[in-house]
């Protein structure tokens, strides 16, 4: 019995001694930490948010892909079916500072051959930089989308199933400069000057008659208004301008887009018009065989969208288009609808 009591006493004494050693080590470690804190240099003063540069503001990269399975049946021809990659675009954009911004967008399924006038590939949609002069004025320069107006024109190509003939035949990514004035958050006015085309005159029109010569300043001048009215109930994308296509030949374009914007229902109506002294859109019946003058184009596009739930969008779109000039039988009427 005495041996058992002696063993228990020795065990308790050993535990107490070990606890004391551990406590001494903890106290010594705390003292060393306090000493390091006392001798460490004071942190540098930095104003609130100073030096904070979120990467998502400087650099954003996107890959956009749109594909389809197309089943087509032309009159008096067999039905065809195919998978088709409509869009494959790589985009980088961001704000370098609060004032300086940039954007680059390139199509990966289009030719990289350089154009003969602006020396850039048509696959490059956008390559521009901008500078915010203040909270109302902005300057932008580089290759950009022309600011014609219209909601179909303004939509992301990823959300387009089929363009109208008017937009399908336009070249609207041009090298140039733009000044923007936004008096408030509901209105924006743009004045833009760009090249009239990507390629030289002869590459588009070929050998022309001696009475037609290339413009000395082949430029496009566009004025555009983007507006939100009645607490964003009505939206506008209106634009118009002049294209100096050749010496003495000017083309006038007008594109008016108006949209009714309700919480679950939206509908827009676009009217697009081109009076071309020298045919540039080139989709009258004779445009592919002769040099057409005084061509007139009109396009009407109506699109309605409904979202019964946030994850579902139901749409229907209709269009009516005309193209003509004074040549005999040189008139086209087109109609279409999508849903």
Locations of regions flagged by a protein language model:
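Positively charged n-region of N-terminal signal peptides that target proteins for export
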Residues: 1-4
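Hydrophobic h-region of N-terminal signal peptides that target proteins for export
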Residues: 9-17
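N-terminal periplasmic/intermembrane-space "pro-region" immediately following the signal or transit peptide
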Residues: 18-66
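Outer membrane beta-barrel
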Residues: 50-73, 77-199, 226-232
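Membrane-embedded beta-strand positions of outer-membrane beta-barrel proteins
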Residues: 63-65, 104, 141, 179, ...
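Sequence/structural signature of outer-membrane beta-barrel proteins
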Residues: 68-76, 107-115, 144-150, 160-163, ...
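Solvent-exposed loop/turn segments connecting transmembrane beta-strands
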Residues: 77-82, 110-119, 169-174, 213-217, ...
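Detector for outer-membrane/organellar transmembrane beta-barrel domains
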Residues: 218, 223-337
């Amino acid at each position: 019995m005495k041996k058992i009591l002696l063993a228990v006493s020795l065990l308790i004494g050993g535990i107490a001694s070990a606890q004391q050693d551990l406590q001494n080590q903890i106290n010594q470690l705390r003292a060393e930490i306090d000493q390091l804190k006392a001798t460490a240099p004071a942190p540098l003063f930095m104003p609130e948010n100073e030096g904070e540069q979120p990467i998502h503001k400087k650099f954003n990269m996107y890959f956009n892909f749109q594909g389809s399975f197309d089943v087509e049946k032309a009159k008096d021809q067999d039905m065809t079916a195919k998978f088709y990659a409509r869009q494959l675009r790589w985009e980088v954009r961001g704000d370098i500072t609060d004032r300086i911004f940039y954007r680059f967008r390139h199509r990966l399924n289009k030719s990289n051959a350089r154009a003969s006038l602006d020396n850039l590939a048509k696959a490059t949609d956008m390559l521009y930089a901008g500078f915010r002069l203040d909270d109302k004025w902005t300057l932008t320069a580089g290759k950009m989308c022309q600011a014609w107006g219209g909601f179909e024109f303004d939509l992301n190509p990823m959300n387009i199933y089929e363009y109208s003939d008017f937009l399908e035949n336009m070249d609207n990514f041009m090298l140039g400069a733009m000044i923007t004035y936004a008096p408030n958050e509901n209105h924006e006015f743009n004045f833009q000057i760009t090249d009239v085309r990507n390629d030289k005159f002869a590459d588009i029109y070929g050998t022309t008659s001696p009475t037609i010569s290339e413009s000395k300043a082949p430029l496009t001048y566009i004025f555009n208004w983007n507006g939100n009215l009645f607490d964003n109930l009505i939206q506008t994308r209106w634009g118009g301008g002049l294209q100096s296509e050749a010496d003495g030949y000017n083309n006038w374009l007008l594109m008016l887009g108006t949209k009714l914007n309700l919480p679950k229902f939206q509908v827009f109506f676009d009217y697009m018009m081109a009076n071309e002294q020298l045919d540039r859109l080139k989709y009258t019946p004779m445009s592919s065989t002769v040099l057409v003058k005084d061509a007139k184009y009109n396009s009407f596009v109506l699109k309605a969208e409904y979202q019964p739930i946030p994850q579902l969008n139901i749409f229907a779109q209709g269009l009516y288009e005309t193209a003509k000039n004074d040549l005999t039988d040189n008139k086209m009427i087109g109609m279409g609808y999508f849903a």
